[in-house]
Amino acid sequence: MEDKPLNLGGHEFQSRFILGSGRYDLNLIKATVEHAGTQIVTMALRRAQTTENSVLDYIPEGITLLPNTSGARNAEEAVRIARLAREVCHTDFVKVEIEHETKYLLPDNAETIRATEMLAKEGFVVMPYMFPDPIAARQLEEAGAAAVMPLGSLIGSNMGLRMRDFIEIIIANAHVPVIIDAGIGRPSQACDAMEMGADAVMAYTAVASAGNIPLMAEAFKHAIDAGRAAYLSGLGKVTEGQAVPSSPTTGYLH
């Protein structure tokens, strides 16, 4: 089955892997992006604003930049950061991140909805990071989100899809792409997310903390592609408490 491109605010992408760039050695970024096969890289505005050794100088040409509003504690701060990012990165894409507690770094859905509505009215392609509440996901759609990005588990935790049940509800009811963000720690977890119907996966910590960063990025690429293909092909039915023979049970030789 031929797949359709990932559509974000009218922009089409073949890759369904979004790569973070927060703590890499700058000299590794180009190789990591190339091994990942990604077309979208996200970064904090402060990393792009550095006058010397800006991350922007190391990201290959043709990559779509997705600046985030990391550090924002409310909608107004997120909007201010997004406007600065538009000037610095020359893009309308923005990943809204609003967290006002530092222990668990959970996104504030109410402020995120407010910021999404404000930024969508200004022509941004808004991709909000959210706690996986299906009601909030619908409200973000109504506010103008181009995609929703529910966390799989605590950011940076590598714990995988701890919020699976709620994410499945979001996927089943979404009219915009659902991108799993935060907590994906292994390629197998990224594959699992794609098998359950996610439109894309964002990973950063799992790649950045690997012994061989470019190779791990490539592993995620293949896992995401495999999970997408499995989803499109139609997964086999799971049977509980009984075996299903894989060979004929009649016509034996006597």
Curated annotation (Swiss-Prot):
Chief localization: cytoplasm
Residue positions binding 1-deoxy-D-xylulose 5-phosphate: 156, 182-183, 204-205
Matches recorded under SUPFAM superfamilies: ThiG-like
Enzyme class: transferase
Compartments where located: Cytoplasm
SUBUNIT field: Homotetramer. Forms heterodimers with either ThiH or ThiS.
Function: Catalyzes the rearrangement of 1-deoxy-D-xylulose 5-phosphate (DXP) to produce the thiazole phosphate moiety of thiamine. Sulfur is provided by the thiocarboxylate moiety of the carrier protein ThiS. In vitro, sulfur can be provided by H(2)S.
Name under which the protein is recorded: Thiazole synthase
Protein's organism: Bifidobacterium longum (strain NCC 2705)
